[in-house]
């Protein structure tokens, strides 16, 4: 695991993209900047924010504040995903699957930033369709939120956790 100066529980912030956008008015163009950021605690919490302002630092600050306000909790399993998941948002489709220890994060830059701040260390991920960063971020977070823990699946199916995880055949049942 990489050495960082961050304390456990402290939020990690990553800037994904900064764009210059313009609005055409009667006197010409008015330029402003947008920023897309993700924030996470490397332990299953992640949020993203999109900010817009006249100056870059203000846009980044706004997006960081929005990201901190919009955090969600993701259930992880040994530094990877519980199971393979798919996520969709408008024209972007993503697929992620768990990987064995030592694989690392094999994903595009936008997805990699999210997976790093959420605390996933081993995953295989692929984006299809539109690679617009905003859509990829939303699709990735949708996919992570759709992931279910074995406890949730067992409860939904009315079975024991050992049956869901495949330990059923190895344990004697009388």
UniProtKB/Swiss-Prot annotation:
Identify this protein by name.
Small ribosomal subunit protein uS5
* GO CC aspect terms: small ribosomal subunit
Name a biological process GO annotation: translation
Source organism superkingdom: Bacteria
Q: Which organism is it from?
A: Blochmanniella pennsylvanica (strain BPEN)
Q: Alphabetically list the UniProt keywords.
A: Ribonucleoprotein, Ribosomal protein, RNA-binding, rRNA-binding
> Which one Pfam family would you cite for this protein?
Ribosomal_S5_C
- Family indicated by similarity: Belongs to the universal ribosomal protein uS5 family.
Molecular function as annotated in GO: rRNA binding; structural constituent of ribosome
* Function recorded in the entry: With S4 and S12 plays an important role in translational accuracy.
Tell me the InterPro entries matching this sequence.
Ribosomal_Su5_D2-typ_SF (IPR020568), Ribosomal_uS5 (IPR000851), Ribosomal_uS5_bac-type (IPR005712), Ribosomal_uS5_C (IPR005324), Ribosomal_uS5_N (IPR013810), Ribosomal_uS5_N_CS (IPR018192), Ribsml_uS5_D2-typ_fold_subgr (IPR014721)
UniProt comment concerning the protein's domains: The N-terminal domain interacts with the head of the 30S subunit; the C-terminal domain interacts with the body and contacts protein S4. The interaction surface between S4 and S5 is involved in control of translational fidelity.
Q: S5 DRBM domain spans which residues? A: 11-74
Listed under subunit, the entry gives: Part of the 30S ribosomal subunit. Contacts proteins S4 and S8.
Gene3D superfamilies registered for this protein in UniProt: 3.30.160.20, 3.30.230.10
């Amino acid at each position: 695991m990489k050495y960082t100066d961050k304390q456990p529980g402290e939020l990690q912030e990553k800037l994904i993209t900064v764009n210059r956008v313009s609005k055409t008015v009667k006197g010409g163009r008015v330029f402003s900047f947008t920023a897309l950021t993700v924030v996470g605690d490397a332990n299953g919490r992640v949020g993203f924010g999109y900010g817009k302002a006249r100056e870059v630092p203000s846009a980044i600050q706004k997006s960081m504040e929005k990201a901190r306000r919009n955090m969600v909790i993701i259930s992880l399993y040994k530094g990877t995903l519980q199971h393979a998941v798919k996520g969709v948002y408008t024209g972007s489709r993503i697929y992620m699957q768990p990987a064995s220890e030592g694989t690392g994060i094999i994903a595009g830059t936008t997805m990699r930033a999210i997976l790093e701040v959420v605390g996933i260390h081993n995953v295989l991920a692929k984006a299809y369709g539109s690679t617009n960063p905003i859509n990829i971020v939303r699709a990735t977070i949708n996919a992570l939120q759709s992931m279910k823990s074995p406890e949730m699946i067992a409860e939904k199916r009315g079975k024991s956790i050992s049956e869901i995880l495949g330990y059923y055949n190895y344990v004697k049942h009388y």
